[in-house]
């Protein structure tokens, strides 16, 4: 079942940044978003559950320095960020 994809303001700002700065990274992000929809907790980008104050969130590697941080609910995949590292 496909879930609705939504973005927090910070996640959308990050996504728009990649649209203007780096098409290759944007293509990788789009591929990861499709994979997250199919398999939220396994697949490409080494999915990893976050801990401590970020429990309930997951991250996937875009590249060596950037991660997608997201949360999955019954009906949505919420993108919190897709630029930098989740500790930034």
Describe the residue ranges of each PLM region.
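Glycine-rich, flexible loop/turn motifs
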Residues: 1, 37, 46
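Enriched for short, Lys/Arg-rich terminal
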Residues: 2-4, 10-26, 31, 44, ...
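Generic structural signal for secondary-structure transition and capping sites
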Residues: 38-41, 55
């Amino acid at each position: 079942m496909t879930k609705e994809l939504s973005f927090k303001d910070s996640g959308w700002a990050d996504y728009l940044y990649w649209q203007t700065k780096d098409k290759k990274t944007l293509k990788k992000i789009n591929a990861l978003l499709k994979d997250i929809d199919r398999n939220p907790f396994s697949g490409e980008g080494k999915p990893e559950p976050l801990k401590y104050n970020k429990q309930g969130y997951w991250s996937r590697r875009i590249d060596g320095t950037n991660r997608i941080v997201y949360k999955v609910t019954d009906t949505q995949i919420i993108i919190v960020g897709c630029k930098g590292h989740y500790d930034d």
